Amino acid sequence: IRTNGEGAYGSDPLWLEREPTRQEVIDAIESANPPSYSEIVFCGYGEPTERLDDLVAIAQYLKAKYPSLPIRVNTNGLSDLIAGEPTAQFFKGVIDTISISLNASTSEAYCEMCRPRFGLKSYEAMLSFTSQVRDFVPEVVMSIVATSDTPETEIAACRDICDRLGVSLRVRTY
């Protein structure tokens, strides 16, 4: 998706020339008239939990000002490894939905596809985070991208993982 254009699925451009400050993010959201949207989503061509403190502070601001506006985070689920500590509890009360990129049914396939900087332990860390965050976020979803070449057995294996974790699976077609 990153190589196909500036944005994805009709979004504004997702590439940034620099990291905006927390206040710049809030100002940009405010200038877009948040009540006119059905949801605020933290996502992009980077990992939003790389700036977990900012993400949580911005979400707290939005929740206080627009309590009925749902907030979602799309994540790779590696925030515990990024932060070096458990992070699921930080989402409590400020995030309504978290979508975690499962991407594959095995750690080997996951690492081949995603090339995480933390290596093979990334897959188990992502599954562990998913299990933990269920206690703090009302809706937890895992996602995979399926093409016409994706075997049904792979989709079924991913669905089994989600069933074991007690979360939903979203299959995105590409």
For each of these PLM feature ranges, what is it?
Residues I1-E6, E39-F42, D96:
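N-terminal pre-triad scaffold of radical SAM enzymes
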Residues A8-D12, S38, Y45, G93, ...:
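A near-ubiquitous, low-amplitude feature marking generic local secondary-structure context
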Residues D12-W15, V41-P48, E112-F118:
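Surface-exposed cleft-lining segments at the edges of enzyme active sites
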Residues I1-T21:
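Canonical Radical SAM [4Fe-4S] cluster-binding loop centered on the CxxxCxxC motif
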Residues E17-Y45:
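Short Fe-S-cluster ligation motifs
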Residues D27-E30, T49-Y174:
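Conserved AdoMet/S-adenosylmethionine-binding subsite of the radical SAM
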